[in-house]
Amino acid sequence: MNVLNYTQKLKHYPDVLTSDQAAEILNVSKQTLYMAIRNKELHAVKIGREYRIVKSKLIEMLVS
């Protein structure tokens, strides 16, 4: 898939995703998502106790 396809597919999600939403999109557990964040495979920002993932960064990861 290319960027446009993912953008269309994910248009109903907000621009900044929670870890639950990102895990749902990737079809992985939250633990697997956190491992990808720790390994710097996915860029995320920790706000309080929760990670936030910019949707465009998630799409970049999916395309690469």
Model-based region annotation:
Residues 26-52:
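Major-groove DNA-recognition helix of helix-turn-helix-type DNA-binding domains
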